[in-house]
Amino acid sequence: MADLLPHDDDELLRAFADHLALERRLSPNTIAAYRTDLRQLATFLARDRSSLARATHQRLRRFLAQQHTLGYARASIARRVGAIRSFYRWAVVAGRLERDPSLLLGRPKVVNRLPTVLRPGEAAGLAEAPPPAADDPLERAIALRDRAALELLYGSGLRVGEVAGLTVDRIDLSRARVLVLGKGAKEREVPISEYAVDAIDAYLQVGRPEMASEDSGHLFFNRRRRPFSERDIRSMVQRYGATLLPGRRVTPHTLRHSFATHLLEGGADIRAVQELLGHASVATTQRYTHVSRRRLFEAYERAHPRA
């Protein structure tokens, strides 16, 4: 009996992408990563006169061995194993394939590095880094935008994609709240600091009118009057980070990590931090307790005469 109902690899990948978008409600970036990983596998199999539909466990293992030989990091290979497993599990459940060749596929162990965290003064300094009002209206608008975005990244712990996707109607300055569309299209309401309220208000009053394209509800824009993309935000954060903290790699996720760690160090309940971050599982949030514990030990070793 044939493994595949009448669908070729491209059709399978399109159907799987639809499943990820419509049923699992994953972000476009995550779906693109799945497609890239699976297309690499499909290309490898085609050279071996096989296909996604006719792949065997042995061929999948050969593909992963090739990835290792090519020098891919363990984390990248582990991600590809996850994509392959998800694809074949879906294909069998959906009736596209009769068997799952990835069932016994092992995932390489990945060292779980603790996230990079800034000191409170460093994070606050970064949020306040954009220069004061410039003579040029556009440059003044950019500085106001950057300050508002940085306050949301550190002051509210938003993901870079969540900041990029913000619309004006999701900001409630009177209540100091923002309605965030997170992973899996899940909404959560997050408080924003007084600093963020002031920064966003200034940007809305002075900066955004200078940058916004007509009839767009997006909150942030780039200098070309297009919505401020994830790539734009990463570049902006790295630029300020390189100026204020030379030699340190600072990303939007660094600010999110710092937000979570500083809350826990201040005594916040881990379940509350989980809700603020939008984590589906508290286990994801618990990694920040390890960071806090490490910093506690470092403080002890620095300060105690018997350490």
Where is each model-derived feature located?
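Conserved catalytic core of the tyrosine transesterase superfamily
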Residues: 1-307
